[in-house]
Amino acid sequence: MKLSCLLLTLTIIFVLTIVHAPNVEAKDLADPESEAVGFADAFGEADAVGEADPNAGLGSVFGRLARILGRVIPKVAKKLGPKVAKVLPKVMKEAIPMAVEMAKSQEEQQPQ
């Protein structure tokens, strides 16, 4: 019973981490006040204003996170016990897509 509670706890922590990661990463990756202004004197003046995309790079962050957790969690599970090692890949196959879908739906619901 204790191993199943541990598995459930780890799964909940994993899913919550993925669901709340877009909010944290968007704040870290893009500064909303970033602007680039340039002037050219060849034929006149030209201004260039750049805008930061708050969702830039999130796919690669989630990919790296999934790969790292995919390597680390089964190794830890094998040390905890063979029952957990059998159940964990099934949980990860279901939890990761579910968490990604939840994150996408959360991004769509946020006002821009």
Curated annotation (Swiss-Prot):
Pfam families: Pilosulin
Key word Transmembrane present: no
Residues annotated as signal peptide: 1-26
Region IgE-binding determinant, annotated ranges: 93-106
GO biological process, one term: hemolysis in another organism
Keyword list, A-Z: Allergen, Antibiotic, Antimicrobial, Cytolysis, Fungicide, Hemolysis, Secreted, Signal
Alphabetical list of InterPro entries matching this protein: Pilosulin (IPR049518)
Propeptide section residues: 27-56
Segments of this protein annotated with the region Critical for cytotoxic activity: 57-78
Compartments where found: Secreted
Domain of life: Eukaryota
Tissues and organs where the protein is expressed, per its UniProt entry: Expressed by the venom gland.
Disulfide bond as UniProt keyword: no
Homology family: Belongs to the formicidae venom precursor-01 superfamily. Ant pilosulin family.
Function: Has strong cytotoxic and hemolytic activities. Is more potent against mononuclear leukocytes than against granulocytes. The synthesized peptide 57-76 shows a potent and broad spectrum antimicrobial activity against both Gram-positive and Gram-negative bacteria, and also against the fungus C.albicans. Adopts an alpha-helical structure.
Name under which the protein is recorded: M-myrmeciitoxin-Mp1
